[in-house]
Amino acid sequence: GIDTYPHHSLENTIIYEMHVKGFTKDKSSGLNEKIAGTYKGLIEKIPYLVELGITAVELMPVYQFDEDDARPHMKNYWGYSPMSFFAPQDSYSSDKSITGPLDEFRDMVKALHKNGIEVILDVVYNHTSEGDDFGPTYCYKGFDKNGYYIINNGYHQNFSGCGNSLNANQ
């Protein structure tokens, strides 16, 4: 069906910044283990957000990122090194089918809207997890390295401090 989002005035907006996995994964969430840490788990927690009077959630990165893109023996928990800006993080979905993450993310957004809660996405558009010239090729580097990234003399320019900088000037 048609999804319409709430329009709260800025003066009346109460934003709850959250990490989808972190907000729903802990045992204190009371969620079934199968949906804890997922978009579906967040749907189940909407009554709690409504009870708090929340009018908007700011979701920390929910686009696809590499959880192993971190120092040895660590994980990339926060997701600030995107692989693809247009694909929901698959590990946050309880539905592991090919369209599961997309379907579950869409259902979560619709459920939040239906309950009067706006959705704000925290995004990083200055770099990707592909790193520098020696980093992995996931997406943009393979499509058109010179088009997507700032390149000088064939090498990535690192204005972001993350190994590469997206060419947002074109």
Where is each model-derived feature located?
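Substrate-binding/active-site clefts of carbohydrate-active enzymes
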Residues: 21-41, 47-170
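The feature marks proteins involved in alpha-glucan
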Residues: 1-17, 25-34
